[in-house]
């Protein structure tokens, strides 16, 4: 299906993931009719067809920023020369998520989300990294601007 869409002119692909590690990805998404290998194959196909590839990275501090998870993400980004990573907060009950992911994914100490982003920038200087969430200063500026209208 993706191949046909790319042949018809699709020029951008966005993939959401919580991890670049198969067991952690699959325990969260619980895919039916596809698996992590299909995600990887789709990324490879999109790259061969020169589509713009963006990842929605669902971030859960303490899991997403584990050293092994960071390195797996870096390898995925480099392997498929991902163009953009858009970070998103994983909005889920933290206790539920920690129970589901226990013992899954790549191990290692938490590095912090700031270090995760720094590592991505270092390993893939071409990568665009963004987040739609606005920082406190930007939110305050927007609020002040609308109050004076």
Language-model regions, residue ranges each:
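Conserved AdoMet/S-adenosylmethionine-binding subsite of the radical SAM
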Residues: 1-100
């Amino acid at each position: 299906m993706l191949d046909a869409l790319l042949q018809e002119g699709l020029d951008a692909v966005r993939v959401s993931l919580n991890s670049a590690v198969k067991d952690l990805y699959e325990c969260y998404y619980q895919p039916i009719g596809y698996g992590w290998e299909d995600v990887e194959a789709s990324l490879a196909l999109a790259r061969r067809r020169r589509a713009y590839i963006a990842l929605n990275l669902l971030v859960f501090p303490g899991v997403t920023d584990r050293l092994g998870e960071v390195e797996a993400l870096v390898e995925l980004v480099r392997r498929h020369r991902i163009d953009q990573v858009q970070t998103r907060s994983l909005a889920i009950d933290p206790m539920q998520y920690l129970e589901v992911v226990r013992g899954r994914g790549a191990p290692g100490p938490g590095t912090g989300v700031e270090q995760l982003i720094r590592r991505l920038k270092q390993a893939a200087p071409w990568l665009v990294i963004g987040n739609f969430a606005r920082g406190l200063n930007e939110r305050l500026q927007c609020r002040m601007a609308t109050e004076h209208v």
